[in-house]
Amino acid sequence: LIFSNACIHWIPDHQTLIPSLFSHLSEGGRLAVQIPYKRKSVFYGLLFSLLDKKWKKLKEIRLFNELTPEEYYDILSSLSADFSIWESEYYHTVNSFDDIIGWYEGSGLRPYYDVLSPAEKEEFIADLKKLISENFKIQQNGKIILKMPRLFFTVTKD
């Protein structure tokens, strides 16, 4: 078994990476992968809209190397007839809009923070928080639901 939980999206060239990982499996072995599916993420949609407008200088930073499900299908089907691809969405609850930003500060926001001055970082966070506050609903109990879309696939070596 080779598995990756929210990891391979940091590695480029999945067209080469996945067959390479697959080649290390024994017969009957399985590759199992879960990645954040940013294309369906409200948070990343807001972040990318911010980059399209005010923060264009950050737009060239490539966070993830995620492919489409169809692209993964083509890769996996070239390796084995025994594979599956599916999506899921986890619902996490947070206490505040700051908690949403905090969730991503250790991962998805870090490449942006790394190139900003302290003053720019503060302004960037304020801009992002404004968008978040306009697009995430506060529930009756005061909590906020943070939807986390995920893409999964498994492939077994015949």
What are these regions (language model features)?
Residues A6:
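Binding-interface segments
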Residues D13-T16, D99:
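Residue-level recognition of oxygen-bearing side chains
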Residues L21-H24, G102-Y104:
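Short, charged, low-hydrophobicity "junction" segments
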Residues F3:
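A conserved beta-strand element that flanks and buttresses the S-adenosyl-L-methionine
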Residues Q15, F22, S26-N95:
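Conserved catalytic/acceptor-binding region of the Class I
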